[in-house]
Amino acid sequence: MLSFILIQNRQGKTRLAKWYAPFSDEQKIKLKGEVHRLVAPRDQKYQSNFVEFRNNKIVYRRYAGLFFCACVDTNDNELAFLEAIHFFVEVLDAFFGNVCELDLVFNFYKVYAILDEVFLAGEIEETSKQVVLTRLEHLDKLE
């Protein structure tokens, strides 16, 4: 199960945070800093996308200048969540048309809607890009 999902840029600014476990505001701030300090200096060529973190694992993937991080239980399948992160980015790319950091900042409510279509209650919910995009199309018609 996911504890949280963070999208941060190279400077450590959080562009999206979704919490699936209860944390206080102080804990959230501390976690954001710790996760960024853990994943930002890692070398993509020589180090894996999985990092031990407290009693969990951080599964992360870097796209351009953004780090997509998910905190999962140690007994969860890391590769499934790594693929789910990639799937989430593919859906963002298809929805926004070559997504960038500014899309996340100015359309954060749509990004949260996409995230909620892919993940539900800390678990992977949907794995079909076409199903997610169809649902998002219906949501866009309501606006």
Curated annotation (Swiss-Prot):
Keywords: Cell membrane, Coated pit, Endocytosis, Membrane, Protein transport, Transport. One of its GO terms (cellular component) is AP-2 adaptor complex. It is a peripheral membrane protein. Its main location: membrane. Belongs to the adaptor complexes small subunit family. It comes from Gibberella zeae (strain ATCC MYA-4620 / CBS 123657 / FGSC 9075 / NRRL 31084 / PH-1) (Wheat head blight fungus). Adaptor protein complex 2 (AP-2) is a heterotetramer composed of two large adaptins (alpha-type subunit APL3 and beta-type subunit APL1), a medium chain (mu-type subunit APM4) and a small adaptin (sigma-type subunit APS2). Component of the adaptor complexes which link clathrin to receptors in coated vesicles. Clathrin-associated protein complexes are believed to interact with the cytoplasmic tails of membrane proteins, leading to their selection and concentration. It is found in: Cell membrane; Membrane, Coated pit. GO terms for molecular function: clathrin adaptor activity. This is AP-2 complex subunit sigma. GO terms for biological process: clathrin-dependent endocytosis; protein transport.
